[in-house]
Amino acid sequence: MKLVVVGGVTGGASTAARMRRLDPAASIVVLERGEDVSYSNCCLPYYLGGVVEDSDDLILMTPQAFRVSHDIEVRTRSEVLSIDRAAKTVHVREASGREYDEPYDKLMLAPGAAPIMPRSIRGIDGPNVFSVRNVTDIRALKNFVDRPGVERVAVVGGGFIGLEVAENLRRAGKQVSILEGMAQVMAPLDEDMVQILHKELDDNGVALHLNSTVTAIEDGCVKAQCGGKEVSVAADAVVAAIGVAPETKLAADAGLALGETRGILVNANYQTSDPDIYAVGDAAEGYNALTHTPGRLALAGPAQRAARAAADHMCGLPHRNTGFIGSSCVRLFSQNVACTGLSEKAARKAGIPCDSVLVFPPDKVGLMPDSHYLAFKLVFEVPTGRILGAQAVGRGEADKRVDVIAAMITMHAGLEDLKELELCYSPVYGTAKDVVNQAALVALNVLYGRIRQVHVSEVRGLVESGAYIVDVREPGEYANGHVRGAHNVPLSQLRARMDEIPHDVPVYLHCRSSQRSYYALCCLQGRGWTNLYNISGSFLGISLYEYYNDKALGREPIVDRYNFN
């Protein structure tokens, strides 16, 4: 069998390597348009900040190494122009201009996705505008920003790549601005969780311009429309990290079907509408296992799994395609960020009845010197309790907790399963009742109606309407920051002061993280109160949720002082 692979990096290189392991006699040719066939594209931004010191280290395998190690022929700077499905050939043009036809028995399309560079933005083709797709791109960007006088960099787009580029440019001492078209960075996160990232960016000197539509890139600045007004952001260099679009022209020109998301349509075996042509990676349309709808996911893990499965199918081996759930993580200065499955907004958009809880437990035993809270949000289906997704932000191991949830989602687990999950424990690594266990317990209380809750996003409306809010923290904590108008009835004094809690209006309880207010709620409910609500996330969640928007919008805070500890 002869396999021709169009495109290298994750999908293409993985397909070729797997095929060689399965079939030592197969003829395998990889055709890569760029200069490098296998490189760590996820590590590209870290070259800007010096985490990766030598750009050559980004290159994982050379064509020579593929030949020696795997007997795979790799031809770089070779662009596939067309596919002749009837003749089973691809037409190739080399950098020299020479063109030829390459025959195949099986063809793998792994062209990836191209950075979105909107032509509506005047100056998008300027010499100081860069994208981050490959090693050549990142070398060019670093060479430019290292020039004398290049100090101000505007990053257009607040997704994974945009944030990683911004962080690393700040570490390199640059003045960095992010212009994002939506009301938040990191679209997969819910609004309550992403406010922590907005604060982190602001704390580290990154100027954040949300709801901004870039209109022009000029000498020394970026023009954008924000709230009906034009703003000008100083910039010596611009990084376009708006997003990516699947490279489907080759497939479409060959008459292969495209899917609803405009990715290459594939079946469960990653075959296109031509059974001898496969497609994987960023260009192919996938299947969301939670919403049961088509989707595209530009992540390395799913691309590698798809590449392996496609090679297996070519060789007659069975596999089980379960689709994707979307698990990812990123570091942003001191914060580790991870998410999996559906956010609350995504679940509601998909028509799935759901609820969520927000908890702030310590990531390890509090006596440990580096213990810190971990903001953890768990999304679940109502009334089944099926786990839909999770998000975590904190200085500790956010990815570890979210990986647990990813595994539970894959196994179709529910809150009761998560509650009983037995995990490793040592004071230096976690708590006896881990973050994920605690989140499940709180979620079960909500699911079964043992408690009622309101979310941090609702607190401003409650304060402005004069709602009765009770802060059960100790007086010293209350003095260090509290919700305006809140009544301080410490948990330690609650039993002696129950007569201060009204029965005839809704009462909203909070503490630092919702644990003590839950204890207070149970105490009062046991004595006959039926009008109680726990504020999910409590004062820590309120402070983190309100802070950045208060500062950016210049609005009146609903707290007399923020407290982030």
Predicted regions and their residues:
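Glycine-rich dinucleotide-binding loop and its adjacent helix/turn
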Residues: 109-172, 207, 260, 266-268, ...
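Rossmann-like dinucleotide-binding cores of NAD(P)H-dependent redox enzymes
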Residues: 58-59, 152-154, 160-216, 299-303, ...
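Short hydrophobic core segments
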Residues: 102-112, 235-243, 307, 385
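Rhodanese-like catalytic fold shared by cysteine-dependent sulfurtransferases
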Residues: 416-427, 431-458, 462-468, 475-508, ...
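Beta1-alpha1 glycine-rich phosphate/pyrophosphate-binding loop at the start
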Residues: 1-75, 79, 116, 166-189, ...
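FAD-site-proximal beta/loop scaffold in flavoenzymes
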Residues: 125-148, 221-223, 232-309, 404, ...
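A Rossmann-like FAD-binding core segment of flavoenzymes
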Residues: 25-27, 69, 75-94, 102, ...
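Mid-to-C-terminal Rossmann-like scaffold of FAD/NAD(P)H-dependent oxidoreductases
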Residues: 1, 7, 283-396, 427, ...
